[in-house]
Amino acid sequence: MPSEFQKRKLALAFYKYDLSKDGILEAKDLELQGHKVADLLKVKQGDAEREKIVSAHKAVWDAYFKPGDTDGDNKVTLDEYAKAVEHYYSNPGNSHELALEVNKSVFDSIDLNGNGQIDSVEYAVFLRSLGVSEADAKVAFERLDTNGDGYISRDEFAKNQVDYFISDDPEAAANWFYGSY
């Protein structure tokens, strides 16, 4: 059973992605996020790069959020999201491997240049598309780049994602996964 702190972080993540601000997650929220990323990068409407960015975010819906839609209405409520997250991370022994698999599309949507690493600019664009300030995005990246090499690897990303949801430590670096908490 998640602690109150863990529930708060889970709700924060859910509402960050709820870009339509209607209390549910749908494919349109991820499509909107893709357009926000493209806007932040000044990619014009109709440009092939914009479509690639939006498609990557639609893939996040399909791989990460849609499996939590237990009633098949193409919408994910906070309760459905909480149950999906609890299922993903209920076994800490294999949660890192599962996070690598489940979060591949999320990582790929942030890794805009496709080099297999996320740099500070890419992470800032991701967080800013979710409404996080530039200053908080900078702090978040510094916290999540656990080896200090200037990049977040797939392993660092997966570990931080798992720790974000399972850690009950208010000082854990992973708490910054979605910006300040």
What is each residue range found by the language model?
Residues M1-Y15:
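Plant-biased recognition of short, low-complexity, intrinsically disordered N-terminal tails
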Residues S3, D47, A173-A174:
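Helix N-terminus capping/helix-initiation residues
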Residues K16-D18, D22-G93, S105:
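Acidic (E/D-rich), amphipathic helical modules within compact regulatory domains
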Residues V60-G114, A124-Y181:
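EF-hand and EF-hand-like Ca2+-sensor regions
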